[in-house]
């Protein structure tokens, strides 16, 4: 095969690739990887565990307005505004979404001393069958609030875990 035929073939392949790619949309940070909108949330106190022992707790319901920005499917961050009067950062790590906030006066000791809690929501998109579904707009996970070890004279972190669910409002 002559050099001119090889060169002509290479030019034809390059031209076809350029024409084929010219119609493709470039990947941008505007992809719908994040969580944005208004959501109804619920933490189910009927299935709460206090220090890994089931104990009925008050359930909580609220409405969250979430705004996130992403630079990739695994790197997003933003803000959650709750109608309960708080706001907190939201971000992704290893496929899970995290919302972390400090809860002042979370619990009170027998002597009336207030205990601050760290509330962490860990959520992921879930399909109708209960499995992870990245295209879903519904989320499930866990609502965990933990107090400091040694609070109220006990050498143990008080921790309350509740199932969590979130869907578009």
Regions found by a protein language model. Name each.
Residues 117-150:
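Internal, hydrophobic beta-strand segments that form the core of beta-sheet-rich folds
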Residues 1-29:
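Secretory targeting and sorting signals
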Residues 57-126:
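Predominantly extracellular/secreted and cell-surface proteins with exposed
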Residues 40-48, 83-84, 100-107, 140-149:
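Generic short beta-strand segments
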Residues 140-169:
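Edge beta-strand at a domain terminus
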Residues 66-67, 127-132, 165-169:
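Extended lipid/amphipathic-ligand handling interfaces
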Residues 46-54, 107-114, 147-157:
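Flexible, membrane-facing loop/turn or short amphipathic-helix motifs
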């Amino acid at each position: 095969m002559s050099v001119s035929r090889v060169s002509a073939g290479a030019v034809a392949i390059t031209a076809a690739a350029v024409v084929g790619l010219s119609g493709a949309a470039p990947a941008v940070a505007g992809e719908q990887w994040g969580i944005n909108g208004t959501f109804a949330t619920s933490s189910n106190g009927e299935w709460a565990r206090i220090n890994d022992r089931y104990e009925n707790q008050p359930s909580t319901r609220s409405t969250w307005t979430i705004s996130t920005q992403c630079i990739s499917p695994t790197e997003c961050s933003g803000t959650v505004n709750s109608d309960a009067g708080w706001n907190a950062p939201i971000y992704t790590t290893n496929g899970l979404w995290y919302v972390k906030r400090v809860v002042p006066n979370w619990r009170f000791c027998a002597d009336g001393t207030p205990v601050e809690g760290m509330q962490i929501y860990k959520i992921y998109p879930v399909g109708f069958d209960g499995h992870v579904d990245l295209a879903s707009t519904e989320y499930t996970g866990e609502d965990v609030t933990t107090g400091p070890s040694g609070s109220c004279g006990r050498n143990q972190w008080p921790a309350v875990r509740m199932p969590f669910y979130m869907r578009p409002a």
